[in-house]
Amino acid sequence: MIENILDASAVLAVLLNEKGRDKVERILDQSAISRVNVTETLTKLVEKGATISDAKKAFDELKLKIIEFDENQSLKSAELRPLTKHLGLSLGDRCCLALAILENLPAVTADRNWANLNLCKIEVIR
C-alpha cells in the first residue's frame, strides 16, 4: 500500500548517500514517485557523471512504484504555480505536490522551503 509520494530530492538522498537517506530508506517500500520526478532524478544523476544506463539501474534497484503523469496531475500542477511561485518551486516540485494532493498522501522531500506550504502534508527529511 502506498503511503507517501517521494520528491526527486528524497530519492537522490538515497542514491547519493546524502543526509536524510535513512528516513527515506525506511519508507521506500510504502512510497511512490511521479514519472516526472523519475526523469528529474535520472537527469541529476547524469549531470553528476553517471551514464543513463547506470542511472536507470541505480534507480530501478529502489523498486519504487512509478505513477504515470496524467491529465489530472497536469491540471493540478498548473494550478499550483501561483501558490508556489514565491518559493521558486520547479515543475518537478509541483508535479510531486500535485500527485500528493490528488492521492491525499504526504509529500516527502529534502527541500526545506516546502515546509512553508499548506497544500498537503509535507515531510522534510533534513
Label each region the model flagged:
Residues I67-V108:
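Active-site neighborhoods of divalent-metal-dependent phosphate/nucleic-acid chemistry enzymes
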Residues R21, V38, I52, S74-S77:
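A general structural signal for well-ordered alpha-helical segments in protein cores
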Residues A10-V11, N37, Q73, C95-C96, ...:
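Alpha-helix capping/helix-boundary segments
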Residues M1-I33, L45-D60, R126:
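Short, well-structured N-terminal submotif of metal-dependent ribonuclease cores
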Residues I66-F69, V124-R126:
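Short acidic-hydrophobic, aromatic-tinged amphipathic segments that line or gate anion-handling sites
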Residues I2-E3, L97, I101-R126:
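Acidic, PIN/NYN-like endoribonuclease modules and their adjacent C-terminal/linker elements
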